[in-house]
Design a protein with these regions (language model features):
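Active-site neighborhood segments
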Residues: 1-22
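Domain-level detector for long, ordered catalytic/regulatory cores in large eukaryotic signaling
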Residues: 21-160
Length: 160
């Protein structure tokens, strides 16, 4: 789905998880708890490929000026490998600009916010505990399972 289609698609799921976070669900009986057990639920890791992760979490594409979901390094500084100098993203900053994007009165205003910050609204931000910076996994299938990360380190950076 496109960026505009993803939020209405996940909104009912987020509604359910808000209720499960605040009220939970009560099981009348379980094998270990004959008197019943209450359970609260949360969505924590967002595990998907990089394109879906960016859409779901409200980050800009990996082609954007702000290409990283963990820092505010600009594409023009992409050759900077000194990670101590990378300005870290924060939840407060992300939520603030995502909320501004959501409340914008026009598509032009939304585009300006998105272009300037690399952030847009995600329905997942309605979850009171959800932190897109900490909970978005770094494309585990391609990075780890298919060993793209290892190949990148060995072939691109020349580290063995």
């Amino acid at each position: 789905p496109s960026m505009d289609q993803i939020n209405p698609l996940i909104s009912p799921l987020v509604d359910d998880f808000i209720d499960l976070w605040h009220h939970g669900v009560h099981y009348t009986t379980t094998p270990c708890h004959p008197a019943g057990k209450s359970c609260k639920c949360a969505i924590i890791p967002l595990v998907c490929d990089i394109l879906a992760a960016r859409q779901m979490a409200g980050f800009a594409s990996h082609h954007h000026q702000f290409f990283c979901s963990f820092c505010h390094l600009k594409r023009s500084d992409i050759e900077n490998v000194n990670w101590w100098t990378w300005p870290a993203r924060t939840l407060d900053h992300h939520r603030h600009h995502a909320q501004k994007w959501r409340l914008a009165h026009s598509e032009d205003e939304r585009t300006k916010i998105y272009d300037g910050t690399g952030v847009r609204w995600s329905e997942l931000l309605r979850l009171p505990y959800w932190d897109p910076i900490r909970y978005t996994a770094l494309d585990p299938m391609h990075a780890l399972f298919l060993n793209a990360f290892g190949t990148h380190i060995e072939k691109i950076w020349g580290i063995s």
